[in-house]
From Swiss-Prot:
Domains: entry comment: A long coiled coil structure formed by 3 polypeptide chains connects the central nodule to the C-terminal domains (distal nodules). The long C-terminal ends of the alpha chains fold back, contributing a fourth strand to the coiled coil structure.
A GO biological process held by the record: innate immune response
Positions that bind Ca(2+): D714, D716, W718, E720
Positions of glycan attachment: N609
Keyword hit for Isomerase: no
Sequence positions bearing 4-hydroxyproline: P504
Record-given protein name: Fibrinogen alpha chain
Molecular function in Gene Ontology: metal ion binding; signaling receptor binding
Amino acid sequence: MLSLRVTCLILSVASTVWTTDTEDKGEFLSEGGGVRGPRVVERHQSQCKDSDWPFCSDDDWNHKCPSGCRMKGLIDEANQDFTNRINKLKNSLFDFQRNNKDSNSLTRNIMEYLRGDFANANNFDNTYGQVSEDLRRRIEILRRKVIEKAQQIQALQSNVRAQLIDMKRLEVDIDIKIRSCKGSCSRAVNREINLQDYEGHQKQLQQVIAKELLPTKDRQYLPALKMSPVPDLVPGSFKSQLQEAPPEWKALTEMRQMRMELERPGKDGGSRGDSPGDSRGDSRGDFATRGPGSKAENPTNPGPGGSGYWRPGNSGSGSDGNRNPGTTGSDGTGDWGTGSPRPGSDSGNFRPANPNWGVFSEFGDSSSPATRKEYHTGKAVTSKGDKELLIGKEKVTSSGTSTTHRSCSKTITKTVTGPDGRREVVKEVITSDDGSDCGDATELDISHSFSGSLDELSERHPDLSGFFDNHFGLISPNFKEFGSKTHSDSDILTNIEDPSSHVPEFSSSSKTSTVKKQVTKTYKMADEAGSEAHREGETRNTKRGRARARPTRDCDDVLQTQTSGAQNGIFSIKPPGSSKVFSVYCDQETSLGGWLLIQQRMDGSLNFNRTWQDYKRGFGSLNDKGEGEFWLGNDYLHLLTLRGSVLRVELEDWAGKEAYAEYHFRVGSEAEGYALQVSSYRGTAGDALVQGSVEEGTEYTSHSNMQFSTFDRDADQWEENCAEVYGGGWWYNSCQAANLNGIYYPGGTYDPRNNSPYEIENGVVWVPFRGADYSLRAVRMKIRPLVGQ
């Protein structure tokens, strides 16, 4: 075997050498005999672990490139990895689809559930609104019934009081008549009078009348619950996103949403009511206003024995029934209000008549040529509200217990001379303790028929008529006209239009004072026995005198001329060149005194966004302490400033800081648009009327020489209506650096962006003092004549 292998090896070598050395080797090579193909070379296992293989060429295939089995293994491994990933993604996709389907189903179920809940809630809201409105209506009916019963109780109190007065007067009249008989009656009738029992009854009745029967202010007006649909449920920034939302989410917009608002009439709250939109529809609305700390009362019912209102332009003495503005009436008592009373209407009030505690005469024990008669009539006014000043047609009252009295004395001296030249001289003098006017001289004339006459006494007691006829037949008819005349205090409070009338001044600090009204008549007769026969043909010469005070021009004149003028209070004035007498509040304590209050804001209870006519006539009310909100009236401002005046503006912020500004001041006539003329500023608040706002520009914000503007009569320099935007009548330019008639915002600083619909600084502002976005707590405007006038 070994030899065979050696032989094969030798043959192979020989064959190779022979082939190389042959001459035909070119033909062999040309036929491809010398070409070698690639040889498969198995690499070591360690060489296949390399991962960075370059591109393989034919020359590099054997010693660098991996084998096909290795490549297939790598390909299979990568394919398996990708397959696993794809399967994992498919499983996740299936899970997400299943979860999405479940979530959609759950969302639809939730939306259906919420839709049902919203529908039920909407029904509940509607039911709640109806029930609350029905409850409010029933409470309102109950409140009106309570007020009606209170008025009936007051009427009964008035009747009881009048009956007590009549009983006491009857007792006094009987006693007077018995004592006037001078012997004959005293022998026939032995009688004693006890007035202490009546005084005790009077005190008890006064205590009963003093009790407050009407609801308090916080219970006087029930808040109203208003429900309205929300217009924009989805904010504008989310509306675009809602378009891309699923249909079930869009169903939320179809659900109706309601807004509930609690409105309190006459208060700043859920609905303030003094915005331009609200006030224009109710520019003459009635608001219950009174000073802080005062007891609440019905706006048109001052309460039992209340002193009532002073209405500029009204005159008349106490008339039976209702007392209407601008009407006059005869003596009487009864309801006193702006309209006829009706159950629950809160207008009208049965007020007890002013007491007149009787009439008596005193005669001496011996006869004399001259006879003296005294008529004593005392008038006591017990009120549940101090003296008040009412401007315009507002129905406002302020309470506080006070008793005021008025004392007047009328003396008549009658002299009759001898029989041959008999004549009668009558001298009449009317005086009062406080120097006030006592009214017309004819009010207490002897020719009036008095309620305490003998005729009336005989009518009340017919069983004693024979006694009076027998014993008093010879008495002069003049002696029969005893009694008293009921004189209601309403003629004092409403007769301010007549120049002859005078409103007595009461000290605002006094709470109780004693009063009596005396009428003294003296007759001197020369021949009493034959007076009836000779009196028919006598010639009568009557001289009647009456002392009348000159009407005061303003508060400074009140300070100089009236005894009670040094105290703050309400007084009656008559400006020069005017035939109108009206009532004003005088401040006699500030600076030199003599200040006349023309405007005041203190609690935001009164709406100042009024019409031109309202600002012309004035509106609002004040009590005798100067508490309340009001505007005196542009007509009165023009009359009071014709001769030049000083304007004082007093400001107070919510921290208690005070400031003032004073100007030379004049207001033009209505034909001039009530143009404002101001100059000569001095003070601590800053010059807002002449200089205006420096930042906004004086030419745009100065109020000097500007006409008065209201929302229904635009006279400003702006292309729009400043009064409508800023919420009150004022002397606007384009538009303001001060506005004391703006909207009252409690708390001071306010955000104008919340002031719908104008989003502007429309508060009670004085820009140099606290800025345009700060609404002041209290402001007052006062005037007085220039020094030297």
